Amino acid sequence: MNYKGIIFDFNGTLFWDTAFHDLAFDIFLEKHGVQLSDDEKRVKIHGQTNPDIMRGIFGDQITEKEILDFSQDKEAIYRQLCINDLKFASGAEDLFDFLHDKGIPFTIATSAGIENVSFYFENMNLNRWFRLDKIVYNNGTFDGKPNPDVFLAAALKLNLPPQETVIFEDSIPGIEAAESAGAGKIYIVNSYGENYSRFPYQIITNFNEVDRKLFA
């Protein structure tokens, strides 16, 4: 089957920044006297929106103002950590150029908020391939992964049914969200050594491994 569009997760997929996020959370949580194991981070943090993360860590009693303040604090730490190491995953830019030359639409669906998305646009030249108004990011109007809303919204941005799209993801909740969205094909991007044995999808570590014939 030939697919008509691509949806990329961003963090841990196009930008391998999981270690930066984990370190930022370590620094943030230490300030608040909280410790999480690596397994707890995978469950409570990876692939989640900041409001869901903060509720998972601090409980439902956390206020909306605390969620906002804590999230901004953590993301400021994260941006400071990764500012000097902003680069796309291997082969990603080649794939962008291929898709652009073929006229195949593609976009990003991310749990990141607008502050980080703007940071990526400014420092990674995302506007070479992407338009901000075509990207789906966490604006507080949809639930985090594994809820499929972010991918369904991205498919709408592409004006395609999800079944005609290929979704690239790295996190377990993200893969589950792609499944629930009804993606035509799913690629797993193994950026941090996760165990994906439960899933039947091709696992890649370089975007040059993507079969271009899928879009012929």
Regions found by a protein language model. Give the residues of each.
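Asp-based, Mg2+/Mn2+-dependent phosphohydrolase catalytic module
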Residues: 1-4, 97, 113-114, 119-216
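N-terminal helical cap/lid subdomain that shapes the substrate entry/recognition surface
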Residues: 2-93, 98-102, 115
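Conserved SAM-binding loop
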Residues: 14, 43, 106-109, 167-168
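Residue-level marker of alpha-helix boundaries and capping positions
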Residues: 16, 86, 108, 142, ...
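Non-catalytic, surface-exposed connector residues within folded enzymatic/regulatory domains
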Residues: 19, 68, 86-89, 111, ...
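N-terminal start-of-chain detector that recognizes signal peptides
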Residues: 25-27, 77-79, 107-109, 138-140, ...
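Short, conserved structural micro-motifs that define repeat-unit consensus positions
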Residues: 105-106, 151
